[in-house]
């Protein structure tokens, strides 16, 4: 990855200098790399002043204080945690395992339907080995024996989701003599819905098939719900048309589908009760994560009381963490990830809004050097930020060395150093009133959105996969990381750019594309929406081409893209808490009522 970062920083600086026709507009950038780290000498003259000059005119984003207070968070209690409920959960878990084992006596379609139900209810993580065994057994002959559109489409989606090779031409039997999808398929809403969901597992070489299927199925499904023929099926259709299943956050899908499954015509009461109790049990774990991280954040002194210019969004950061990896056994990973998200949120506001260019250069240099003594040259308000970041990263690396004998510090440091060098480049653009080209912007913005840092933190915090060899993924598989993070960047820009422009921030991808292409904002947003779809197809391809990569790692990365669609679906759900309030309530606050 280092070579890509080096080339990007150099080329971006060169292009800016040329287009502004003034070397004084952009500070000369001399970039060097040492031991795989980004080490950029971006400061021409470094001030030694340590005080924050109160006479400096500073911008303000006027962020609202958090709606979830510290005392409220600490008061959270889950009535379904532990006690008799824990025993009941274990009993039901065993009952469902028996049900899964008895699937061998049923036809393959029923087996796949049961697996799909387990996944959507959010309990499949308990039965991964059994599910894989069923899929291995069914895979070889399933497609050849199925004739219905529903059965073929369901199998296509599940097998591709789990890494099995299924060619797209299995849908050829549903075409007429002219090669078009048969009009008679319109009599099968369940099959059409399954086909719509299956299409979102197609890859970029299957782009034409994707658009044909999605256009055909979307038109039919929109017409179907107008007539409301079947309440349960119509609910599924509306849900899918909002966001396809493959793009949905797993825990939010579980919460929604548990309610939908309760109204389904063939609900299994044991499975429903288990899903409810298990959801509440996992939610209790996430509440403990929230309380722990809320205490940590308050103890750092970096919260709203001290850093009133920045977003204080620890609850949203916890929401991000559970959206990316929710399973109870990964509590340490979630907590370390929340630290990363909290630092990204705070320091992004320092670079975007509060800091002067001189201060930002000092901070970037301090992180590049990764030396505790560098703190002495920082202004006072930056010192606790650097100190807490420095201590947290080193402590996390020490944990990994003690527990697994792996030195993760180089990977963590490189990610943060790269991020802040890109933040600094964007700050220089703003300082000089420079409008980057769309390419210049995206060459930096895919990383400056924080996605790669989020991924590397999560991965370094997981016990089993984090070996030195696997950590080198971040150099060898640079393009894959860029794809996932690009989805995050596009959704972030679509959700936040209007608010950020109002307070005078840098232009985002929408504005860069509008300026370069001469299109309207509506057209630019449509273009980015299309690019998100195209990027998902590339993600699907990379996932299929790299089956040797850890399922846990791949899950973290793809779930980050899913969380981006969720958090920025209705605007900026990270900065504006009202946009994410319902999701916080459903995943972190309110359990599902149980008898």
Curated annotation (Swiss-Prot):
Origin: domain of life: Eukaryota
Gene3D superfamilies xref list: Farnesyl Diphosphate Synthase, Terpene synthase, N-terminal domain
Binding site for Mg(2+) 2: 348, 352
UniProt short sequence motif DDXXD motif, positions renumbered to this chain: 348-352
A Pfam family: Terpene_synth_C
Keywords in alphabetical order: Lyase, Magnesium, Metal-binding, Mitochondrion, Transit peptide
Tissues and organs where the protein is expressed, per its UniProt entry: Expressed in roots, rachis and leaflets. Accumulates particularly in glandular cells of the leaf rachises.
Intracellular or extracellular location(s): Mitochondrion
GO biological process: diterpenoid biosynthetic process; limonene biosynthetic process; sesquiterpene biosynthetic process
Primary residence: mitochondrion
Range of the transit peptide: 1-39
Catalytic function, reaction form: (2E)-geranyl diphosphate = (4R)-limonene + diphosphate
Xref: InterPro entries: Isoprenoid_synthase_dom_sf (IPR008949), Terpene_cyclase-like_1_C (IPR034741), Terpene_cyclase_plant_C1 (IPR044814), Terpene_synth_N (IPR001906), Terpene_synth_N_sf (IPR036965), Terpene_synthase-like (IPR050148), Terpene_synthase_metal-bd (IPR005630), Terpenoid_cyclase/PrenylTrfase (IPR008930)
UniProt signal peptide: none
SUPFAM superfamilies for the chain: Terpenoid cyclases/Protein prenyltransferases (SSF48239), Terpenoid synthases (SSF48576)
Biological function: Sesquiterpene synthase involved in the biosynthesis of volatile compounds known for their medicinal efficacy for treating enteritis, dysentery, itch and some cancers. Mediates the conversion of (2E)-geranyl diphosphate (GPP) into (4R)-limonene. Can only use GPP as substrate, no activity with farnesyl diphosphate (FPP).
Protein's name according to its UniProt entry: Sesquiterpene synthase 1
Organism: Toona sinensis
């Amino acid at each position: 990855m280092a070579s890509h970062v080096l080339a990007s920083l150099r080329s971006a600086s060169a292009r800016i200098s040329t287009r502004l026709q003034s070397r004084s507009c952009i500070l000369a950038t001399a970039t060097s790399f040492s031991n795989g780290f980004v080490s950029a000498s971006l400061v021409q003259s470094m001030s030694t002043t340590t005080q924050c000059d109160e006479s400096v005119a500073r911008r303000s984003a006027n962020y609202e204080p958090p709606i979830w207070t510290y005392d409220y968070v600490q008061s959270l209690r889950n009535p379904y945690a532990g006690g008799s409920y824990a025993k009941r959960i274990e009993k039901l878990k065993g009952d469902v395992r028996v049900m899964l084992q008895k699937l061998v006596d049923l036809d393959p379609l029923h087996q796949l339907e049961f697996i799909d139900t387990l996944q959507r209810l959010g309990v499949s993580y308990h039965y991964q080995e059994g599910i894989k065994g069923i899929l291995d057994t069914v895979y070889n002959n399933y497609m050849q024996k199925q004739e219905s559109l529903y059965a073929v489409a369901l199998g296509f989606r599940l097998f591709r989701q789990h890494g099995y090779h299924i060619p797209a031409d299995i849908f050829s039997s549903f075409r007429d003599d002219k090669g078009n999808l048969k009009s008679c398929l319109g009599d099968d809403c369940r099959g059409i819905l399954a086909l719509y969901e299956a299409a979102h597992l197609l890859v970029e070489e299957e782009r034409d098939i994707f658009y044909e299927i999605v256009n055909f199925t979307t038109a039919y499904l929109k017409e179907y719900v107008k007539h409301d023929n079947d309440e349960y099926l119509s609910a599924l259709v509306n849900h899918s048309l909002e966001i396809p299943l493959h793009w949905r956050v797993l825990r939010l899908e579980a919460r929604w589908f548990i309610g939908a499954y309760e109204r389904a015509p063939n609900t299994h009461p044991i499975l429903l009760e288990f899903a409810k109790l298990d959801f509440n049990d996992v939610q209790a774990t996430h509440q403990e994560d929230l309380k722990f991280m809320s205490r940590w954040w308050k103890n750092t002194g970096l919260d709203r009381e001290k850093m009133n210019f920045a977003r204080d969004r620890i609850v949203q950061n916890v929401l991000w963490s559970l959206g990316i990896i929710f399973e109870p056994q990964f509590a340490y990973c979630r907590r370390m990830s929340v630290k990363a998200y909290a630092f990204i949120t705070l320091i992004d506001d320092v670079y975007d809004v509060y800091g002067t260019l001189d201060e930002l250069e000092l901070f970037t240099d301090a992180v590049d050097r990764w030396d505790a003594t560098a703190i002495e040259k920082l202004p006072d308000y930056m010192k606790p930020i650097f100190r807490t970041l420095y201590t947290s990263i080193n402590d996390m690396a020490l944990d990994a060395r003690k527990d697994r004998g792996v030195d993760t510090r180089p990977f963590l440091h490189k990610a943060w150093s790269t991020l802040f060098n890109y933040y600094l480049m964007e700050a220089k653009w703003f300082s000089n009133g420079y409008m980057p080209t769309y390419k210049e912007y995206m060459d930096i913005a895919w990383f400056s959105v924080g996605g790669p840092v989020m991924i590397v933190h999560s991965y370094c915090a997981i016990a089993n996969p984090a070996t030195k060899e696997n950590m080198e993924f971040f150099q060898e598989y640079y393009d894959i990381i860029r794809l996932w993070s690009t989805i995050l960047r596009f959704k972030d820009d679509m959700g936040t750019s209007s608010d950020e422009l109002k307070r005078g921030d840098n232009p985002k991808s929408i504005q860069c594309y509008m300026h370069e292409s001469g299109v309207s904002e509506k057209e630019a947003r449509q273009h980015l929406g299309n690019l998100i779809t195209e990027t998902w197809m590339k993600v699907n391809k990379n996932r299929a081409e790299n089956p040797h990569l850890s399922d846990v790692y791949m899950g973290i990365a793809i779930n980050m893209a899913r969380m981006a669609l969720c958090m920025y679906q209705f605007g900026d759900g990270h900065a504006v808490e009202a946009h994410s309030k319902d999701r916080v309530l459903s995943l972190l606050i309110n359990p599902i009522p149980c008898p």
